[in-house]
Every structure is written in structure tokens, then in C-alpha cells.
Swiss-Prot record:
GO CC terms, sorted: extracellular space
Protein name, per record: Endotoxic shock protective protein U9-ORF
Lineage: Eukaryota, Metazoa, Chordata, Craniata, Vertebrata
Stretch forming the signal peptide: 1-16
UniProt organism field: Mus musculus
UniProt keyword list: Glycoprotein, Immunity, Innate immunity, Secreted, Signal
Length: 87
């Protein structure tokens, strides 16, 4: 049974390339033909990286967007005063 599991692991990782950006940890890049197989393998073993084209590049803000923050930043009504009025 152990031999079968080891052979299956070797077959699945035959196309994986080790990534050396993270010293001390082993991460594998899996260029399988089917992306679902690679994702399942990576999620199961937690040792694979996603291919570079499928990574997210958008940044999600880590703070809550509330109206109270907007009111505290302005400090008052947004109407022009005498000094800022251009006549």
C-alpha cells in the first residue's frame, strides 16, 4: 500500500518544478495540463504554488469603509468660507 501511494505521489509531482524564492521551505510549481488537478494537488499537500498567470494582483483594503471615518476627516461642512471664496 505504501509503495502505491509513493508511486502515485511521484507520478503527480513529475512535472513540478521546485521554487527557490522561499528558502527553508519547499514549494512546487505544477504546470499540469488541467488546472483543477494542480489546484487539488496543491490544496491537498499544501506544497504547490499557483502558476504565475493565475495569481491575483488586486489589493483588498484591510480597513472597514464607514461613513463615520469620512465625517471625522472633514471636520465640518463642505461649503466655501470667505477666505476660500474666489470673487
Amino acid at each position: 500500500m505504501k509503495v502505491v501511494i509513493l508511486m502515485a505521489l511521484l507520478v503527480l509531482t513529475a512535472h513540478c518544478v521546485p521554487v527557490s524564492r522561499f528558502p527553508g521551505k519547499i514549494f512546487l510549481y505544477c504546470p499540469f495540463f488541467n488546472r483543477k488537478h494542480c489546484q487539488r494537488f496543491c490544496e491537498f499537500f499544501k506544497i504547490c504554488r499557483k502558476p504565475p498567470l493565475s495569481r491575483r494582483t488586486t489589493v483588498v483594503p484591510s480597513f472597514p469603509l464607514t461613513t463615520e471615518a469620512d465625517l471625522s476627516l472633514t471636520g465640518g461642512p463642505l461649503t466655501p468660507d470667505r477666505r476660500g471664496d474666489s470673487r
